[in-house]
From Swiss-Prot:
Superkingdom assignment: Bacteria
Residue numbers binding S-adenosyl-L-methionine: 145, 166, 188, 229
Keyword annotations of the record: Cytoplasm, Methyltransferase, S-adenosyl-L-methionine, Transferase
Matches recorded under InterPro entries: Ribosomal_L11_MeTrfase_PrmA, Ribosomal_PrmA_MeTrfase, SAM-dependent_MTases_sf
NCBIfam families recorded: prmA
Transferase recorded as keyword: yes
Protein name: Ribosomal protein L11 methyltransferase
Amino acid sequence: MAWLQLRINTSSEYAESVGDMLSANGSQAVTYVDAKDTPMYEPKPGEIMLWPDTQVVGLFEADADMKSILQRLGKAKVLGPDFKYKLEPLEDKDWEREWMDNFHPMQFGERLWICPSWRDVPDPDAVNVMLDPGLAFGTGTHPTTALCLRWLDGIDMAGKTVVDFGCGSGILALAALKLGAERVVGVDIDPQALQATKENARRNGVEDRLDVYLPQDQPELEADVVMANILSGPLLELQSVITNYCKSKGLLVLSGILAEQVSKIEDAYSQDIVLEPSAIDGEWARVSGSKR
């Protein structure tokens, strides 16, 4: 089935209203896209974050009466009769197959590979984590995840106890287990993330060495390795919580940090952590070290 895609640029103040109008006029799906490639930071619980310049995208059936729809949209105060838009056809494709074709096994460091389940692993003797894009949040494609995975690949994980703070999809937890960790505890504020982590662990055959908890439910422990790939705001707010998970001489790795935020993170953690030189990938950074 062919589709028409309508793109409208607006501000964050009006983006949801524009999206509601598209839905009311027959859009089968509405998405919000950053119009100017602006970094987005961690929202507060219950808060919906939109970019200052937001592009609202509506998907319409090919036979939709777009002339009438555009006329109705132009009567809305938040748009006005001279609003700017882009209307373009989307050719009929096997979108699922095209989506799958875009993902390939990725290598991090010397040993570690992240592989979609529908692909053959390039090296059966390597450390292979099977993880499908779309099941949850991190799949190795974002620089913050890649920075942590490359760090993990260089660590002797044999017999280690690990905390993955803000585990998301569980990609870092799974990598640690596949690299030889004895036990990993995943912590996240989102129950869906915990469910995704458990499911991904089951798919990789390591569920018996993984426990997951909401922050308020996690038992006290001191781990050999603590990983926190979240964002700088929570890293600063939760500095004492994160460092307390780490035993003396244990290892800590932090990411989700913009390069310009490194000094602030290092200042917050330097009292408790002997810091290594930070690593940079594009606009993102990794901070790591060992507990005093």
